[in-house]
């Protein structure tokens, strides 16, 4: 649990057996969670989106693209909590790192500090240069719609104009 909220991850790469922990750090009971070694050394690259200081210089939105956007935007701030998105993203990413490593995965973190300057393109290049089996980008998007809730997952498709050729690989 993070700040009293529960989040779930679905992945063909994650398998747990036994009773799950409530995630409540205040509990004195030991977790009976047992994990298998499903990761078998697969490399997972985790990017905690954003950073303490945005970089408004621009870069292409994708490989070979003419359209450009800021290298790293500021992200959002929690309306209720006041937590900056880059802080929450790193907190979630570090918990995911621990969970994946406990399951036998090798994990590369794009950042382990908020005080970095790593562009979006550089983040993808780091995952690609290490030939990661999966690249997970953690974000906590916001909305001006007060009725909006839930989660969003974005994944590679064969229709991606920048890298559709790797869809089946």
Question: How would you name each of these model-derived features?
Answer:
Residues 4-6, 39-41, 131-133, 148:
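Extracytoplasmic
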Residues 10, 55-59, 147-149:
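Short, solvent-exposed loop/turn and secondary-structure capping segments
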Residues 80-169:
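Active-site-proximal helix/loop segments of hydrolytic enzymes
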């Amino acid at each position: 649990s993070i700040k009293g909220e529960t989040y779930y991850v679905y992945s063909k790469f994650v398998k747990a057996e036994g009773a799950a922990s409530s995630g409540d750090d205040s509990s004195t009971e030991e977790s009976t969670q047992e994990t298998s070694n499903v990761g078998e050394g697969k490399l997972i690259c985790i990017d905690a989106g954003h950073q303490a200081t945005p970089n408004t210089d621009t870069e292409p939105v994708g490989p070979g693209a003419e359209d450009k956007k800021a290298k790293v935007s500021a992200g959002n701030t929690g309306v209720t909590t006041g937590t900056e998105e880059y802080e929450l993203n790193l907190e979630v990413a570090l918990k995911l790192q621990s969970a994946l490593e406990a399951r036998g995965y090798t994990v590369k973190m794009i950042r382990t500090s908020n005080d970095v300057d790593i562009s979006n393109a550089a983040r993808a290049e780091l995952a690609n240069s290490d030939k990661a089996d999966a690249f997970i980008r953690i974000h906590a998007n916001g909305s001006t719609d007060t009725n909006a809730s839930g989660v969003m997952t974005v994944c590679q498709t064969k229709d991606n104009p920048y890298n559709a050729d790797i869809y089946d690989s």
